[in-house]
Amino acid sequence: MKCAYFDANQCLSCRHLKTPLSDQVAAKTATLAALLKDLSVEQWLPPVVGPESGFRNKAKMVVLGAAHQPILGLVSPSGEAVSLCDCSLYPQDMQQLLHRLEAFVRQAGIPPYRVDKAKGELKFILLTRSQVRGEYMLRFVMRSEQAIPRIERELPRLLAEHPEIKVVSVNLQPVHMAILEGEEEIFLTEATRLEEEFNGVPLYIRPKSFFQTHPEVAAKLYLSARKWTRELAPTSIWDLFCGVGGFGLHCASKEVALTGIEIEAEAIACAKMSAETLGLDKVRFTALDSTSFASDSRGEEKPELIIVNPPRRGIGEALCHSLSEFAPKAILYSSCNPKTLAKDLHCISGYRVTKVQLFDMFPHTDHFEVLVMLQRIGE
């Protein structure tokens, strides 16, 4: 992949851009193998890769410059404000829309937030794309409600020009800190969610719902999870840190009892909607902390399979101990941080690692996703 930003030393996020993709994946595989070397992995499946450009479905743009000349991008290593609207990680239609949004901010006269002076209004523009429909969710992260009338004044023209924008909202983040978003979301459109689909499973995205950024690789990740689960044929599943339900809904069926737990209420609302669309009635999604749920469920009937898909910090010692105590037949662990994955796997007792597969969700970086199947010793 060629990148003028990287060549000009303006953006170095894709730090391994000059390394062939096959070599990147080989290095990631070696890193993972070294971390799991003490676990006697029974089967290493081939790594999964996808397009190295034009794949990303989410843009997080810092708004820089001034109201009359806004820049959507980042501050370069030299301190220069750089527009990233032409970033090759984004599909062409997203690049074009980002350019239009720079013009929108200028036409609306919204002053970008200045961190050094703690002045201004617009902090970030967050743009999310549904790959199945090519539709968008647009979020303006603002310091206050002061400039919302300016957005509302220009919005009808933007939506007329770009009917693919289905959801528009303002997120209020009043704190002078490096925090991406605040608690309050104000919708400026009737629609409040995007529709997405992977492998025939409908998923819904709301503003604060976590979603994978590489749709093609994510679809293959979900397929592997489904295949491995169906080989075990569990009758009951817990999906912890379930998000919008991607893993659990791929692994569920009308005969399987599925319980999904996620602390973010918006994501749970989306998961419930997907289950209803699929006609699954043995499903329960609840907004709770996953570790607390597991701890509070001791003494209750345990599932045959537990799926965990935690944030980068991993599942932690307390949940590792709960899983060891529950002793389900199998544990399916999806991780975006191999270091915390390795730490957690060493902490869970009574299991053997039967399958491991790497998914190159973040090309040109050191990051990747891993799917691991654990089966109880003796099963």
From Swiss-Prot:
What is the role of the protein in this entry? Catalyzes the formation of 5-methyl-uridine at position 747 (m5U747) in 23S rRNA.
What CDD domains does UniProt report for this protein, alphabetically?
AdoMet_MTases (cd02440)
Q: What is its EC number?
A: 2.1.1.189
Task: Name the species this protein comes from.
Answer: Shewanella loihica (strain ATCC BAA-1088 / PV-4)
Its keywords, alphabetically, are: 4Fe-4S, Iron, Iron-sulfur, Metal-binding, Methyltransferase, rRNA processing, S-adenosyl-L-methionine, Transferase
Family annotation (NCBIfam families): meth_trns_rumB (TIGR02085)
Residues noted as binding [4Fe-4S] cluster in the record, renumbered to the chain = 3, 11, 14, 87
Catalytic site positions: 336 (nucleophile)
Catalytic activity entry:
uridine(747) in 23S rRNA + S-adenosyl-L-methionine = 5-methyluridine(747) in 23S rRNA + S-adenosyl-L-homocysteine + H(+)
Q: Does the keyword S-adenosyl-L-methionine apply?
A: yes
- According to its UniProt record, this protein's enzyme class is transferase
Provide a GO biological process annotation. rRNA base methylation
What family is this protein classified in? Belongs to the class I-like SAM-binding methyltransferase superfamily. RNA M5U methyltransferase family. RlmC subfamily.
Keyword set includes Cell wall biogenesis/degradation = no
What name appears for this protein in its UniProt entry?
A: 23S rRNA (uracil(747)-C(5))-methyltransferase RlmC
